A protein has these predicted regions:
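Beta-propeller blade termini and top-face loops
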Residues: 1-490
Length: 490
């Protein structure tokens, strides 16, 4: 990292080449060229190191302040820090993801705090100790303390639900509920077909759609983990037996019978670093399965399964990268199945763009939306219609302003005009919207509380079925052959 020019120039060119390839530098950036550029002061060793990182590195490569617990004994008039020692390795750099402090209802000095682990104090927060063991999944996000029996505790985490009857000394997993936090889902064309999903902190899973999992015919076809990390977008190429997966912040890979190959678009030294959302949109073209799209703050296209990438847009965000959590990034990406090169993009800062010529020209159509209702809101989904070329559906999310209203719009003319389609929907944030692939009138909608259906192109909505628990539906897909609706719940 701190290597000077002279030291760099005496390194083995093979080692430099290995460094370049192992860190996803562009394939045409060769060791001999880099050596020559450093020699001529056109590049520095530090510049190479800086290029390995991206704008997302600010989330992790920071000096972390430890967790701090404050207490008020006068109804919030004043607060004081309860502990002198630093509470390290609890929330790391993303305490906002947890943020739970719970007090025992029978003892004001017994307190629990959630983080990657789970900690407890019995002296009013002066000292803290671990209240979990290795059987409990990391990332504790919810806690319930039995008001009648304080030692009875239930916690929710990225792996499900765990229960303790002795105040956190020992735990048992409540694994009779098949729970997981799906971000996205995909299907293949095998018989029976498989379902794929990217899950929070549980990688990418693959499992048979058959309800005969445990019969001899399909023995061993239960869910299997095919990739790690926080699983995100999944694309399946049935023809070439390839699966495209990824984990947080746009780390994308191609899976085959060989070793996984990282295919995240690289950036050249001197270019703006690529900003990527936690759940970076990656999409395989419906027109040609060799073609992939990847959306950070720009859209990239690969014509050869992710081996090489070309930017097909400029920055499609407002470019205001606020804080240490990546911002000003694409959140949704959709290609029309009716026309190659007709692509829609939505961003976390409320912009919607469309191109109908493969990225040569982009039109910012969010300016045509009612600005008072939509400006600056997170685009949870923009999706092209499979029936009408110029139609698209748009859903937005306004969590940032403590607002759970459903924001749903439709355009019939490539974004020139938008129609509010929320109509009779309840106050539930919308995560996904898709038209049925066979019936033009049928539209499905996944919200934070379930699944809705319209049979009149969104003029009215009804809850679909009555057996789905009250759970957030983050993705949905209708299998093209079986005509079965598959939901991914979070």
């Amino acid at each position: 990292k701190n290597m000077d020019k002279e030291t760099f120039l005496i390194q083995d060119p093979k080692a430099i080449e290995s460094f370049l390839r192992g860190n996803n530098f562009p394939p045409d950036m060769k060791a001999e060229d880099v050596i020559e550029q450093v020699k001529n002061d056109e590049m520095t060793p530090q510049g190479l190191v800086d290029q390995i990182a991206d704008d997302n590195a600010d989330l992790f490569n920071v000096d972390i302040r430890s967790l701090e617990i404050y207490r008020s004994d006068d109804n919030g008039e004043s607060f004081y820090r309860t502990h002198q020692e630093d509470l390290q390795n609890v929330v790391f750099s993303y305490g906002y993801y947890f943020g739970q402090v719970k007090v025992d209802p029978q003892d004001v000095d017994t307190v629990y705090a959630t983080g990657v682990p789970f900690i407890k104090s019995t002296d009013g927060g002066k000292t803290w100790h671990s209240a979990w063991d290795s059987s409990v999944h990391a990332d504790i996000q919810a806690i319930w303390i039995d008001p009648n029996h304080s030692n009875h505790i239930i916690v929710g985490n990225d792996g499900g639900v765990d229960e303790s009857f002795d105040g956190g000394k020992s735990w048992q997993k409540l694994d009779h509920q098949p729970v997981g936090q799906f971000y996205t889902i995909a299907v293949d064309m095998e018989k029976p077909y498989n379902i794929y999903g990217g899950l929070q902190d549980n990688g990418t899973l693959k499992g048979s759609s058959s309800n005969l999992w445990h019969d001899n015919q399909y023995k061993g076809k239960d869910w299997e983990r095919i990739f790690g990390g926080d699983g995100m977008h999944v694309n399946v190429d049935d023809e070439d037996k390839l699966t495209y997966v990824g984990f947080q912040f746009g780390n994308s890979f191609r899976l085959s019978s060989a070793a996984p190959k990282k295919i995240t678009p690289p950036t050249y030294v001197g270019e703006d670093l690529l900003r990527k959302n936690w759940n970076t949109p990656v999409m395989m073209s419906t027109h040609n399965k060799d073609i992939l799209y990847f959306a950070g703050h720009k859209v990239y296209r690969s014509m050869n399964k992710g081996d090489d990438w070309t930017a097909i847009s400029d920055d499609l965000t407002e470019s205001e990268n606020r804080g240490n959590v990546p911002f000003a990034t694409a959140t949704s990406l959709s290609e029309s199945p009716l026309k190659f090169g007709l692509i829609w993009v939505g961003t976390d800062d409320g912009l919607v763009w469309v191109t109908d010529d493969g990225g040569n020209d982009w039109n910012k159509v969010s300016k045509r939306l009612p600005q008072k209702q939509t400006k600056g809101k997170w685009v949870s989904r923009i999706v092209a219609s499979p029936h009408t070329e110029q139609r698209a559906w748009l859903a937005l999310n306004n969590y940032r302003n403590d607002d759970i209203q459903p924001y749903l719009y439709k355009t019939e003319n490539l974004g020139k005009n938008w129609q509010d389609m929320s109509h009779n929907l309840p106050n539930e944030t919308i995560n996904v919207v898709k038209e049925d692939p066979k019936n033009d009138q049928v539209v499905y909608l996944g919200t934070d509380k379930g699944i809705y259906i319209s049979i009149d192109q969104g003029e009215s909505w009804d809850m679909l079925g009555n057996q789905l628990p009250t759970v957030p539906v983050h993705d949905l897909i209708v299998h093209p052959r079986e005509n079965e609706l598959v939901l991914g719940t979070h």
